[in-house]
C-alpha cells in the first residue's frame, strides 16, 4: 500500500519536473496556490496570540542529552520557512549549536522546491532538506538524492510519537531500486481535526464537549431543539472552492473506515464510488445539507466564504455554535485570533465514533526533515530531533505542535497549543490531507469541484461517480 501511495503522490502538483510546463499545472497550480497563500497569511496573523516572549529557548523542562562535539563543522539546511518561522527555527537549532559547536547554515526560500531539486540534481545538495509535504521527498528518494536516516530512527519514532507508525509510513519511500527506507523525520506538525466553539455559549446553554461522534450528533440535535443552529459551514474559496468540504470528507473517512482504506482511497485502489467513500460523503451531508444544522441553510454552504464562516460564532446572538476547521482559521476571526487569548473561542477534538473501534485518528500535516548529504554532525542533528528538549525549545516560542509523547506539555506557549499537542500525542492514527496526496487533477480539481456540486444539491452517488470518472481519465 505504501508503494502504491508513492506512485500516486509522484503525480502531485509539487513534482518539480512538471513545474517547467505551466500548461500542465494550469488552474490546478493556481487554485492550490490560492489555498496555501491564504493559509500562510493567516498563520502569520495568528502569531500575535500564539507566541510569547522568551529569555532562553534552550532552557527547557527536559534536559538535552549528549549530542557529541563537532566544533566548526557546518550543517547546511534548505527549506521554505521564512519570517517568524525561520526565526523560531534558528532559535531552536541554536541549542544544538551551543551543545556541539557545530554551525547551522539555513537557506529559506518560497522557491524551495525548485531550488532544492536543482541543487540535488547538480550534485550540490544541502545536508538537510525540509519538505513541507511528502510528494517531492518521495520523488527525490526515488531518484537517489536522499540518504536513509536509518531503521533505528524509524523504530524510535514508532515508539515515541503519538500514532508513531503513521509518521514512520509518512517518511518512508522507495529508493531508485524500489526498496523502502525511512527518509523523512517529521518535526513541527499541523492539526486539522478541530471544532471551534464559544465557551461562554456552551456554558450558558449547558452544553458539554462531546467525546464521541455519536455525542456530537446528539449535541447538534439538542442545539436545534433549543432553537440554536449547530454549524457554520462555508466552502467558497475563489479558484480553490470546495477544499474545505474535502477536509470534512477526509476527517470523516478516518472515523468511518480503516486507515488502510484511507490509503487505498488516496491511491484510488479504493474507488471514489465505493460504499466506504459514499458513506463518508453522506455523513458529511448529514451536517452540511441539513437546513436545521447550518447557519443560512444548506443552500448557503457553497456560497459562504470559508474565511467568513467562523464569524457566526461571534455575532450577537451567535448564528452558529460550532465550526470545524484547522488551527489556522483563527486568523479569520473578527479580531484575528485575539478571541482565543480572551477566552471567547476554544477548540475541541473532532471525535471518533464510539462504535467504530478506530481509535483516535487525526488529520493534519507536518514538515519532513530529510538527509541529502551525510556527515557525522548531520547524523547528530537527527539525533537532536529525537530529544524532547528540541521540541520544547520551539514549543516555548509558539506556533509549534509535536506528536512527541515525551515532550513536556507545560512548555507550550498557550493553553490552546497545549490542547492541540495533547491531541497529537494521544492520536492512534495520523494521516496527511488526502487531497494533497492525490494527483492535482483530482485533489485540486475534480474533488473540489464535485464537492461544491454536492453542496449545491447533487447526490452523493453522482458526485462520487464523477470524481471516479476523472480518476479513470488520467490513468
Outline where the language-model segments fall.
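A structural signal for short loop-to-beta-strand junctions that line the ligand-binding cleft
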Residues: 118, 126-127, 158-200, 357-362, ...
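Conserved C-terminal helix/tail region of periplasmic/extracytoplasmic solute-binding proteins
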Residues: 56-63, 68-70, 74, 203, ...
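Extracytoplasmic/periplasmic solute-binding protein
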Residues: 174-187, 193, 217-270
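Single conserved hydrophobic/aromatic residue that forms the stacking wall/gate
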Residues: 1-11
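Extracytoplasmic "Venus flytrap"/periplasmic binding protein-like
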Residues: 91-167, 200-211, 312, 321-322, ...
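Glycine-centered hinge/linker elements that transmit conformational signals in sensory
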Residues: 220-222, 266-302, 350
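Extracytoplasmic/periplasmic substrate-recognition and gating elements
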Residues: 94, 121, 318, 325-328, ...
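Hinge/lid segment of periplasmic solute-binding proteins
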Residues: 56-69, 134-193, 244
Amino acid at each position: 500500500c505504501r508503494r502504491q501511495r508513492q506512485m500516486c503522490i509522484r503525480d502531485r502538483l509539487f513534482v518539480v519536473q512538471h513545474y517547467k510546463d505551466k500548461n500542465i499545472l494550469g488552474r490546478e497550480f493556481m487554485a492550490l496556490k490560492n489555498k496555501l497563500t491564504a493559509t500562510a497569511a493567516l498563520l502569520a496573523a495568528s502569531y500575535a496570540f500564539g507566541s510569547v516572549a522568551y529569555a532562553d529557548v534552550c532552557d527547557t523542562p527536559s534536559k538535552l542529552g549528549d549530542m557529541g562535539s563537532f566544533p566548526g563543522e557546518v550543517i547546511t539546511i534548505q527549506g521554505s520557512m521564512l519570517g517568524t518561522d525561520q526565526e523560531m527555527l534558528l532559535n531552536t537549532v541554536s541549542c544544538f549549536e551551543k551543545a556541539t559547536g557545530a554551525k547551522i547554515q539555513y537557506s529559506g526560500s518560497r522557491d524551495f522546491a525548485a531550488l532544492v531539486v536543482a541543487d540535488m540534481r547538480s550534485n550540490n545538495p544541502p545536508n538537510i532538506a525540509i519538505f513541507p509535504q511528502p510528494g517531492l521527498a518521495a520523488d527525490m528518494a526515488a531518484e537517489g538524492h536522499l540518504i536513509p536516516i536509518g531503521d533505528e530512527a524509524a523504530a524510535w519514532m514508532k515508539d515515541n510519537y503519538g500514532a508513531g507508525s503513521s509518521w514512520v509510513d509518512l517518511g518512508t519511500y522507495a529508493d531508485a531500486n524500489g526498496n523502502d527506507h525511512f527518509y523523512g523525520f517529521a518535526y513541527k506538525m499541523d492539526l486539522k481535526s478541530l471544532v471551534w466553539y464559544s465557551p461562554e455559549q456552551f456554558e450558558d446553554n449547558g452544553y458539554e464537549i462531546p467525546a464521541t461522534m455519536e455525542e456530537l450528533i446528539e449535541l447538534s440535535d439538542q442545539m436545534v431543539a433549543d432553537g440554536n443552529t449547530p454549524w457554520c459551514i462555508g466552502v467558497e474559496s475563489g479558484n480553490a472552492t470546495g477544499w474545505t468540504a474535502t477536509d470534512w470528507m477526509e476527517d470523516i473517512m478516518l472515523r468511518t473506515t480503516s486507515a488502510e482504506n484511507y490509503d487505498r482511497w488516496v491511491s484510488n485502489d479504493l474507488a471514489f464510488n465505493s460504499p466506504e467513500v459514499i458513506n463518508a460523503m453522506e455523513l458529511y451531508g448529514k451536517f452540511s445539507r441539513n437546513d436545521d444544522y447550518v447557519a443560512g441553510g444548506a443552500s448557503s454552504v457553497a456560497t459562504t466564504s470559508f474565511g467568513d464562516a467562523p464569524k457566526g460564532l461571534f455575532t450577537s446572538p451567535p448564528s452558529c455554535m460550532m465550526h470545524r476547521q484547522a488551527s489556522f482559521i483563527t486568523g479569520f476571526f473578527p479580531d484575528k485570533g485575539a478571541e482565543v487569548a480572551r477566552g471567547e473561542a476554544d477548540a475541541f477534538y473532532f471525535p471518533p465514533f464510539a462504535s467504530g473501534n478506530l481509535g483516535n485518528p487525526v488529520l493534519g500535516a507536518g514538515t519532513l526533515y530529510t538527509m541529502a548529504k551525510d556527515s557525522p554532525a548531520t547524523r547528530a542533528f537527527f539525533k537532536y530531533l529525537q530529544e524532547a528538549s528540541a521540541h520544547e525549545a520551539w514549543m516555548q516560542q509558539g506556533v509549534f505542535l509535536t506528536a512527541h509523547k515525551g515532550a513536556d506539555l507545560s512548555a507550550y506557549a498557550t493553553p490552546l497549543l497545549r490542547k492541540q499537542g495533547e491531541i497529537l500525542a494521544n492520536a492512534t492514527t495520523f494521516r496527511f490531507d488526502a487531497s494533497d496526496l492525490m494527483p492535482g487533477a483530482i485533489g485540486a480539481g475534480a474533488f473540489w469541484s464535485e464537492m461544491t456540486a454536492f453542496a449545491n444539491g447533487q447526490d452523493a452517488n453522482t458526485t462520487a461517480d464523477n470524481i471516479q470518472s476523472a480518476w479513470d481519465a488520467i490513468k
